[in-house]
Amino acid sequence: MLFRSKEYALVGLDNGTAFIDISDPVNIVYLGKLPTHTSPSIWRDIKVYNNYAFIVSEAGGHGMQVFDLTRLRNVANPPQTFTEDAHYGQFGNAHNIVINEETGFAYAVGTSTFNGGAHFVNISNPLNPTAAGGYSGSGYTHDAQVIVYDGPDPDYQGQEIYFGSNENEVVIVNVTNKNNPQLIATINYGSVDYTHQSWLTEDRSFLLIGDELDENAFGFNTRTIVANVSDLDNPFYFFQYFGNIASIDHNGYVKGNRYYLANYSGGMRVIDISNIANQQMTEIGYFDTFPANDNVNFNGTWNVYPYFASGNIVISGEGGFTLVKSENFGLEDQSIQAFSMSPNPARDFVVLRSAQSPIYSVVAHNLLGQEVLNVNHFDQQERSEEH
């Protein structure tokens, strides 16, 4: 019996969104592209909720495209040109989109609505997204993270909290009540030039902040600012980490005790943050997508995605798409696993569970090697999926 899981990379292009099957990492398949809704733009952002991709762009009039990712499972003759399944047009251009998968809300930021602050969209029905208000009180947000709070501050347990990177500061906003979002606090730091993006540690005690333009403005090596946010009402600057090279930081994400940083000409840097509470961060690896230099310029890596169950990491940027894996993992195929059942033939029910990778198909053979079962469709409520 075999069971297989699928992983897809969704990569923003200047003229659309590319879909790549990376389930077999040494034999990837370009499945096709969803063209931009309007005109080309080098800025395009994609997030996923319940098997749907939500896509925004800085292109004028673009709005938010919705694409059903289950269509990728049976692409007969790749690459194909796809069409969107739904569209939301209550804003035009947007720099970014943030989704809280726990609540079913999307937050478009950097639009022409709500002073560039968060534009709330209810996506609980992905094919019929609806406007749900917004937050304009702190001006333009470039990027954000939104969570159902489960950190150390008892005052905000279970509430929906927004951490917005707002060019010259980070804002913390309670967005639980979409009709009345409330500013909780702001985070400031020295030598600010452009507060670009930030991400929480998994224990929610610290926020890692990237300033996109400080390396050029002040001559720093790559700098990451760390704020203590264990008390949301009273966050404070904690310390700053400087990398080994001069290149510009762009987006960074935490997985476990590692911080994966898109570092433009420096490629992707991997930083150990296991001792962050003692103001220590240590680079432990990197993959350089722009080997020509590590200068302060906008060449190289724009983004990284380290959250696949397989351990594969997607890097995207001016050089295109790159798929890498930690040297701690081998290249052997982990997506297909075979096992036997006793007795064979089996009777009654067989229950299959996967602790990490979702199960997409099951193939069963009898003792003669004949295929007796081939199932590739499962009730959505009986399994979870990750793209």
How should these model regions be labeled?
Residues 1-329:
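Feature marking well-ordered beta-strand scaffolds used for ligand recognition
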